[in-house]
């Protein structure tokens, strides 16, 4: 058995971001007013960690079989605009737009003990155990950036910068490969373009693919049942070794304008839908054959997902 956590961003400038907790098909807890834009969540040991972007907070909750123990612990990030995170060796590394860095939170003391400066606005962050890999999504002037930076954890320094094409967004470690979803815009933001890149983390070789006009992708990238999926045309579709989207394997067919987020575990795929950015919204849960299993009713703009296995 497991608990499923879904973070709902809420509306920018208000504090109605929330976290919904489900066991099986049932909602067992809804934590309202977590803050202003609940950006990302992750499970580490018996804790759920949430980044609240526009409240500039990290919230840490103890997980029990009954859900999250309240009120949890709050850590201020000092107006940094925190975004995404990864845990390595009991330290939380999280990206920040305003301060253009990766801050390091000690998960024993809850003290932010250091920061690693990067060049641009960092978004997704993953770890291979020895190095952090960080997607630089935008330059300081909000134009599309083009790099992924490899940072040695021990020395806290950038050891290599990989050019991967415009708008790197989400990262996914898949054995020796790092997948990069990309989204970028023309100069006046009237057109959106999509691509996928892949870094061979052993050889350093980079593959880059741009998708043609008319493909509607999102940035979400995850692995389920041995395949890497990306949001595509109102659902999710697998990517092949040449980085092409395989439309025949698509799961879900929702209005592509309303598909807000997607994620997956080994057996389940979550598709978060909003039509008006107001609560209630819906997460559709599919199995990896593509069949719809059930629907979760959640708060405004479901954005991220995490699972805790009940021991």
Place the predicted regions along the sequence by residue.
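Predominantly soluble domains enriched in secretory-pathway, periplasmic, or organellar proteins
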Residues: 1-311
């Amino acid at each position: 058995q497991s608990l499923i956590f879904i973070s709902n961003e809420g509306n920018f400038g208000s504090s109605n971001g929330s976290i919904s907790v489900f066991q099986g098909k049932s909602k067992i807890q809804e934590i309202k007013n977590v803050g202003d834009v609940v950006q990302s969540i992750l499970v580490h040991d018996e804790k759920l960690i949430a980044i609240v972007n526009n409240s500039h907070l990290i919230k840490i909750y103890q997980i029990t079989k009954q859900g999250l123990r309240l009120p949890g612990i709050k850590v201020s990030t000092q107006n940094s605009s925190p975004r995404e995170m990864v845990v390595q060796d009991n330290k939380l590394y999280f990206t920040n737009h305003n301060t253009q860095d990766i801050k390091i939170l000690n998960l024993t003391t809850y003290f932010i003990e250091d920061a690693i400066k990067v060049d641009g606005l960092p978004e997704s962050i993953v770890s291979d155990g020895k190095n952090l890999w960080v997607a630089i999504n935008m330059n300081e002037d909000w134009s599309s950036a083009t790099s992924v930076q490899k940072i040695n954890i021990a020395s806290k320094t950038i050891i290599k910068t990989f050019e991967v094409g415009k708008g790197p967004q989400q990262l996914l470690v898949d054995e020796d490969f790092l997948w990069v979803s990309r989204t970028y815009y023309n100069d006046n933001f009237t057109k959106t373009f999509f691509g996928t890149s892949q870094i061979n983390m052993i050889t350093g070789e980079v593959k880059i693919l741009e998708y043609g006009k008319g493909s509607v992708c999102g940035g979400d990238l995850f692995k389920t049942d041995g395949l890497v999926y990306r949001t595509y045309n109102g659902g999710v579709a697998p990517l092949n070794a040449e980085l092409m989207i395989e439309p025949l394997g698509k799961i879900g067919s929702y209005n592509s304008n309303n598909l807000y987020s997607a994620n997956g575990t080994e057996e389940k795929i979550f598709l978060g839908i909003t039509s008006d950015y107001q609560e209630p919204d819906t997460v559709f849960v599919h199995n990896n054959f593509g069949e719809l299993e059930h629907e979760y009713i959640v708060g405004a703009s479901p954005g991220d997902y995490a699972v805790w296995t009940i021991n």
